[in-house]
């Protein structure tokens, strides 16, 4: 009989096997072919259980291998470094919030429910949208859910997505719609401006099966889409839903999606008080305009205000018949354990920042990213491939292969941008990149290029 090397549960295993009428673990797993089973002890925990001291020592030895950068990373691609006020970490670390419990029971969850309602209210004001849910996993999953939602509403099968939208988000969408019969048609972008190609949009939208049209603002290259309202008009004309993906911080400078009547808005709250987390967990934003055909098809949880039997105001989850814990396979979405804790972090961050703080932060990011782009393009033969205005992220074209530049930056303990092509990279600059950090990046790249050209 199988015996676990150290967990003292052998009697319990025997009881469980007896209860289900099985004589051994081997019999329980006899459907698994013998040739793929491992019939030896695994070298887990160095072959023995480790003490707390030994575990801590092992982890610390691995941590020492980390490289401490001379400046904040200049890589973004949708997940960017920002300063997080200590109050954000403090509040979400409180035991009332720091839980995986879903507030199904409003009578014991008023604090958590009210905090989530505040998040929804703040995000709705920021986006100028009517209804915001309590969170999604991330931008990619929110976009995928928006595509599925559009298909449920109008039954159409084609979704237009820009080539200059985040490729990682598009990959998530393609994964989620597998087996649904939904087709993703990519719309080209203008190679000079970096913005959506309106002629190609008109061409691709000239069919009757358009379910939704998606546009990202700013787009993957950090460029503001100056014709976004025209895209919304095209969607209306085709009786398709418009989906806008937006960087929340950019709304300190530009018009919110609700002002130009977007149907669905998605995004990520990572830039509103969340760390990089090696790419996750993140915090998906999902909002719709006031239309019950949209609201009833929304994924995720929604917190609302009601009154109890004594007439007192209270908070509770609403429209729960949309959700999988009630309707199972007929639910609008299978998203269940969402990012409630991170939504509260967003609420704290937005409350702390306020309207003026949001505008000032957006301006700071705008000017710092433009300063970095200007200094980089002052290097001989370094240029920007796109001429349109940008925010936070921007593409730079180099005269030598970017891999060589990236390797040199790593030698100097600097993290460069994301490689877009052999000679082009996407850089990210936020409020944490001061003049010293930017100048260090520029001087290191200039030294590298000059050294190659003179050798």
UniProtKB/Swiss-Prot annotation:
UniProt-recorded name of the protein: Probable glycine dehydrogenase (decarboxylating) subunit 1
Record-level Gene Ontology MF annotations: glycine dehydrogenase (decarboxylating) activity
One GO BP: glycine decarboxylation via glycine cleavage system
Function: The glycine cleavage system catalyzes the degradation of glycine. The P protein binds the alpha-amino group of glycine through its pyridoxal phosphate cofactor; CO(2) is released and the remaining methylamine moiety is then transferred to the lipoamide cofactor of the H protein.
EC number: 1.4.4.2
Annotated keywords: Oxidoreductase
Chemical reaction(s) catalysed: N(6)-[(R)-lipoyl]-L-lysyl-[glycine-cleavage complex H protein] + glycine + H(+) = N(6)-[(R)-S(8)-aminomethyldihydrolipoyl]-L-lysyl-[glycine-cleavage complex H protein] + CO2
Organism, scientific name: Saccharolobus islandicus (strain L.S.2.15 / Lassen #1) (Sulfolobus islandicus)
Transmembrane segments: none
Subunit structure, as described in the record: The glycine cleavage system is composed of four proteins: P, T, L and H. In this organism, the P 'protein' is a heterodimer of two subunits.
Homology family: Belongs to the GcvP family. N-terminal subunit subfamily.
